[in-house]
């Protein structure tokens, strides 16, 4: 390893320890020429992942984009950033373990939804509404029904009617909604 001070290429390792949760190794080194000490980090270099978008375009996987989407889904829910980072780490590790270096945005979206379902139903629905491009309150009701435990009976008709009645009050936004109110 080249000394950052004198550029001599020989150094000895004084100490090594795991860093960044085991994702890197921190090494304290000493230059054999000038005796100065410096620190280096050794990390795994991952082969880049390519994301295939809905329209067929390909772009490099962007961890920060995934992180922003998940943070937005949680909103002001108060979940710790460390938990969101851990979730992104899990999803990224899952993608890195795949043999194929290309992944569809749909596969990433489903992985996020699966993880959010376990963490926060509110964040799950918020993410699903953008990812699945909800167009009406009915889409929300349908998604909420998938979250219910199977032993529950049908949805509360009063709550569903209130949701749909609210949508019916604004038919210019959702012309199909007037048909939905009578289904409950």
UniProtKB/Swiss-Prot annotation:
Lineage of origin: Bacteria, Bacillati, Cyanobacteriota, Cyanophyceae, Gomontiellales
Co-factor remark: Binds 1 zinc ion.
Organism: Cyanothece sp. (strain PCC 7425 / ATCC 29141)
Biological processes per GO annotation: negative regulation of DNA-templated transcription
Protein name, UniProt field: Transcriptional repressor NrdR
Domain ATP-cone: 49-139
PROSITE patterns referenced in this protein's UniProt entry, alphabetically: ATP_CONE (PS51161)
InterPro entries: ATP-cone_dom, NrdR-like_N, RNR_NrdR-like
Keywords, ordered alphabetically: ATP-binding, DNA-binding, Metal-binding, Nucleotide-binding, Repressor, Transcription, Transcription regulation, Zinc, Zinc-finger
Zn finger residue spans: unnamed: 3-34
Keyword Transcription regulation recorded: yes
Protein family (similarity comment): Belongs to the NrdR family.
Known function: Negatively regulates transcription of bacterial ribonucleotide reductase nrd genes and operons by binding to NrdR-boxes.
Pfam families with a match to the protein in the record: ATP-cone, Zn_ribbon_NrdR
Keyword DNA-binding: yes
GO MF entries: ATP binding; DNA binding; zinc ion binding
Cofactor(s) needed by this chain: Zn(2+)
């Amino acid at each position: 390893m080249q000394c950052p001070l004198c550029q001599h290429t020989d150094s000895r390792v004084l100490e090594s320890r795991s860093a960044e949760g085991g994702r890197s190794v921190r090494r304290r080194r000493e230059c054999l020429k000038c005796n100065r000490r410096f620190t280096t980090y050794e990390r795994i270099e991952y082969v880049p992942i390519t994301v295939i978008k809905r329209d067929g375009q390909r772009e490099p996987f962007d961890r920060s984009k995934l992180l922003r989407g998940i943070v937005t889904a949680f909103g002001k829910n108060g979940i710790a950033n460390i938990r969101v980072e851990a979730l992104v780490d899990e999803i990224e590790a899952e993608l890195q373990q795949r043999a194929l270096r290309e992944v569809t945005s749909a596969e990433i979206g489903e992985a996020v939804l699966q993880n959010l379902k376990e963490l926060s139903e509110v964040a799950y629905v918020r993410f699903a509404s953008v990812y699945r491009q909800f167009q009406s309150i009915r889409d929300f009701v349908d998604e909420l029904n998938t979250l219910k435990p199977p032993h529950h009976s049908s949805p509360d008709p009063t709550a569903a009617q209130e949701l749909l009645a609210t949508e019916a009050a604004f038919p210019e936004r959702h012309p199909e909604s007037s048909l939905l109110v009578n289904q409950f």
